[in-house]
Amino acid sequence: MNEQKKTMTQETQNREDFIMLPTVDFCFKELMQNAKVRQGMIAALLGGEPEEIEETILLPTILHPEYPDDKYGILDVKVVLKNGSQMDFEMQVTAVSYWTKRILFYLGKMYTDQLKAGESYEKLKKCIHVGILNFIHFPDDDRCYRKIIFCDKDTGEEYTDLLEIHVLELKKLPEKEQNESGIIRWMRFLGAKSRKEFEKMAKEDTYIDLSLIHISE
């Protein structure tokens, strides 16, 4: 009887400790349905305060082909900001050899899809691809976060800010430090593996706390 009771107690504890991980595709998409979660994460990526992100709207995630033989693109999450800038988020758990080519395809398609025939190029707004990787894509350094832009090869001068790629490599996260930047805190949240880790981070960031509440429901 005591052994049966012990087993039942353990099963109850396991159920209470269970939590869906953000690296699971479905969980990540559900997280981004929450406007406050989007606000916090986007602010961290753009280096601003959440209050500065006035509005975010989810867009359809299918990039339709222009011609019958063209390839479709299917994004995880696509968002438009109040200023018209667009961001697409992709959670990629396993390494694939064509990842770089695929994100360039998605980014280019997202940029060109802004215009219809006859519309002015002046209407084009900034497009940002955010790749959240649960594997190491750049093996030659230990930088876990990087922003890639168009720039002059010789001078390093930025050519345009209309296209950006943000790469978050969760496997490269260093040991925790004091006063970490917002994007590093979000990366820790996205890569966490237990309820205990989530709860600890939630105490340090209001928007991460909202994320924990959302995935716990």
Name every feature range the model reports, one short phrase each.
Residues 1-212, 216:
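Elongated, amphipathic alpha-helical interaction scaffolds
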